[in-house]
């Protein structure tokens, strides 16, 4: 479907139009791609390192704890999908607003998407809190694993509140071209804060798998603070790509 769409003559990106008008890529466009994309590339690499370190520590807690942890990660991914969808909306609307020279409208779009995300987060918190046991019983019959999962869910309800909002704000910043800041913020939060807090609570303080999830919560709070502060400063609307 994606390939077919770019062969339509009336699309914004149209292969027939490009070929008929002999449009060729320029070196300046290539430099812009590198300028915007290099920070995102390193951000993703370093974030994956942070995720891997967290997974290693979770696996070290034992098979039962790891099983409960993995289900918790899948449940958290569900809430991420809501934030990711609103992030895509914010990126498109903010990009269009900034392109039209209307930074105030871009900020309003960001705030509106964040409010919608906060409402969804509150709804998910209720579902996760009251349905924690039921959700884990869909995966496990062993009550001791379900008990571990319920404890994890009690941390996830706090994670969700910060997660959805930070994903939206990070998307707003990326849509404006502030990719270097988001890369630095994500690297500090995921690779450093998540790893250190997980080790501190999971091993040093002896909370086990719940301590690993405290690291996940610390990561989300840090990213939320970084993204919110940057968004409210408003400097991102002045970035030229």
Language model segments and positions:
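A periodicity- and composition-biased signal for non-globular, repetitive helical segments
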Residues: 54, 76, 102, 180, ...
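Membrane-helix interface segments
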Residues: 64-65, 179-180, 208-209
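Short runs within selected transmembrane alpha-helices of multi-pass transporters and secretion channels
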Residues: 1-3, 84-87, 156-175, 181-193, ...
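Short alpha-helical transmembrane segments in multi-pass integral membrane proteins
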Residues: 1-38, 94-159, 202-241
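Helix-terminus/linker motif at the lipid-water interface of multi-pass membrane proteins
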Residues: 45-72, 78, 96, 136-143, ...
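Small-residue-rich hydrophobic transmembrane alpha-helices
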Residues: 68-132, 163-186
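Hydrophobic faces of transmembrane alpha-helices in multi-pass small-molecule transporters and flippases
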Residues: 1-4, 22-53, 78, 82, ...
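Transmembrane alpha-helix boundary and packing residues in multipass membrane permease domains
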Residues: 40, 44, 52, 56, ...
